[in-house]
Amino acid sequence: MKAELIAVGTEILTGQIVNTNAQFLSEKMAELGIDVYFQTAVGDNEERLLSVITTASQRSDLVILCGGLGPTKDDLTKQTLAKYLRRDLVYDEQACQKLDDFFAKRKPSSRTPNNERQAQVIEGSIPLPNKTGLAVGGFITVDGISYVVLPGPPSELKPIVNEELVPLLSKQYSTLYSKVLRFFGIGESQLVTVLSDFIENQTDPTIAPYAKTGEVTLRLSTKTENQALADKKLGQLEAQLLSRKTLEGQPLADVFYGYGEDNSLARETFELLVKYDKSITAAESLTAGLFQSTLASFPGASQVFNGGFVTYSMEEKAKMLGLPLEELKSHGVVSAYTAEGMAEQARLLTGADIGVSLTGVAGPDMLEEQPAGTVFIGLATQNKVESIKVLISGRSRLDVCYIATLHAFNMVRKTLLKLENLL
């Protein structure tokens, strides 16, 4: 099946907004086994939109239009598609009720006649309810071509796609089952090299590597009758892949850390902290609180994290953490001594089970004769204080800080997994 995405809106063409819907929809279609062959952006112009719809209908089986469902005159998507399909626009009862409920709480003058357009669907469509907005979406098949209309705002589009469109398409088309494997500590080029025979000879399941910032994912996919068969096929392939070794001889399973498109090292670490009822603190220099803010972004973070320190300068490291200033000057802030001292003092001062520290050179200039991207990460527990040195070269300041936090979370994760193996 060939799909085409059409983004409607002059603001996309003028660069006022970024078309993030295209990426989201492409991922969702891939999960369903639907191939997106074309992506188009067109302005709020009926003639040009008609031309784009005509072209899409000649080359695609599924046409998804995003944007242009609002109440204003330049919101033309449903009207133009209805004209192309030679169908009337009718009112969806549920969408009309939502308009009534919405404006019942507002001044009567706020409900202008053009608002009613948002409750219209093309005659013969399956309405796609909009839980977070007023403009109803729709799905219709005419002459073997399926058309979808969706609102433009991502906050409205995503719930409709996840809760309405994906289940609808799943019933109509064969389902693609996928499993995403996540790796940290290996680059995409090496991972592809190690698995080259699998990738070059793949049929079903398929293997698709993706490079992320600081990590790599593999999407394993198969088309089959049900989830149980898919789990069996994907599980067998996963076991074969993870049995391979890196070019350094390290088991690939050692750099694999979890599953899922929306998973992360931080989430895996947080869940282990909760599982083992361990508290954590941090003292951060170059990352300036990024580790702690990431940790605090998870609901329930207060179970494991009460607070920490941001000590950017040498003087603040001495003042807030109680580290000897002369020793800091002697060893330098970019050193194992400083990283270990920061982690241990943070742990002792807060009473946490685990203390983490990050200190180094975000760049672009050198510091203490250390190149940009040099980072020391400390970790302290009741039984041990240690540190690692990593070099994150050729990256921006933001990437250096982000990847440094990944290393820190991975260090904590491995420590907690050792605890798990002892139980």
UniProtKB/Swiss-Prot annotation:
It comes from Streptococcus pyogenes serotype M4 (strain MGAS10750). This is Putative competence-damage inducible protein. NCBIfam families: cinA_nterm (TIGR00200), molyb_syn (TIGR00177), PncC_domain (TIGR00199), PRK00549.1 (NF001813). Transmembrane segments: none annotated. Gene3D superfamilies: 3.30.70.2860, CinA-like, MoaB/Mog-like domain. Belongs to the CinA family. InterPro entries: CinA, CinA-like_C, CinA_C, CinA_KH, Competence-induced_CinA, MoaB/Mog-like_dom_sf, MoaB/Mog_dom. It comes from the Bacteria. It holds the Pfam family CinA. The gene is cinA. The lineage of its organism: Bacteria, Bacillati, Bacillota, Bacilli, Lactobacillales.
